């Protein structure tokens, strides 16, 4: 048993990434996830409860739902246990975040981009290559060219990450190392490399 919270519980994950007072942690992680694409400077947490569109349909409660300062809507989920049809569930979640953007009256169908970031403490598809990250976009099947940038899913399969602390070469890998081992750590690694990891430690000490 380590000093820090277990991020694979609903409470632990939302405490880590879902609090307004510590939203810099989520901003930092998202920037390290999307490094080289664009820089997020702020996020606004949105209502994570999505009501059904028609009576008798199922509603959705996201773990974390936010909008960036550049307009992307981002769903962040932690799934601890293996679940059948998880790919379909992820598609359903993003689809609802898209259809909820529809406006009454005159509307030109312009959409905000919707990203889904799915942490999984299991292997999603044993027939696929054992990679830590699977990045899904809408692209042309023949050319591979991006067709529409309004839909993106990033699946992070934690069991496929096997690097030791001194083998982590990027800040994204450092985040994944910390998340995978957090509830067994006695100290927060990588503090000398990036200030956000010290902030992360200070945030978690308050509940340890």
Q: Which stretches of residues belong to each language-model region?
A:
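Elongated, amphipathic alpha-helical interaction scaffolds
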Residues: 1-208
